[in-house]
Amino acid sequence: ESTRPGAEPVPEDIELQRIIPILSEIRAKWQDIIISVDTRKSRVADAAINLGANIINDISALRFDPEMADVLSAHPQVKVILMHMQGEPQNMQVNPHYDDLFGEINAFFEERITYAEKKGISYDHIYLDPGIGFGKTAEHNFQLLAHLEEFHRHQLPLVVGVSRKRFIAYLDNSSVEERWGGTLAAGLVAALKGVDILRVHNVQAHHQFFQVLKAINEVSEWKS
């Protein structure tokens, strides 16, 4: 199910038809990798978990489907990503507004964490995602990236996705295919701010980028 701004919901049966074959194939081929599945639907989450998914990424933070929390609590080995989003994908980019950006998102996280724990989900199985590009203006997104440390107060792993998102084009009107420079810059900032998981499209490019940074940082001086 696409979560792009303006995207229409996908019926549950269609989502299952899309996920089950590829998830089955991936898990059969690679038994040890960690698999995260994006879904707001409890039935899809349950099927994915039974096929070996390790993480459920719910962009609604357990609000869309009242049975999602029950499915997750029934599988205590599975972790969940709770993402902040103002509105729904169909309308989230229609004049998003905050009186207190960080205060409102942190209050949302506190409420969702409390709800998850009451439903039997372990605190240390929760990841938080401030939702870059989900119900935020470009300015909001830049503010979030500049101050991601504001979310460390929850003492939970942080997840951020910035890859090719529209806020990058705010600066130069670039197309989706032209946003790799901005993607890497935003990803670097997120890493420096202590983000634990960076969601990306081009794994190889990001791996190379961070490997080079690591190599440079490990060298005390350059010799010709």
Regions found by a protein language model. Give the residues of each.
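Active-site metal-binding loops of divalent metal-dependent hydrolases
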Residues: 132
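Short acidic capping loops at alpha-helix termini that bridge into adjacent secondary structure
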Residues: 32-33, 122-125
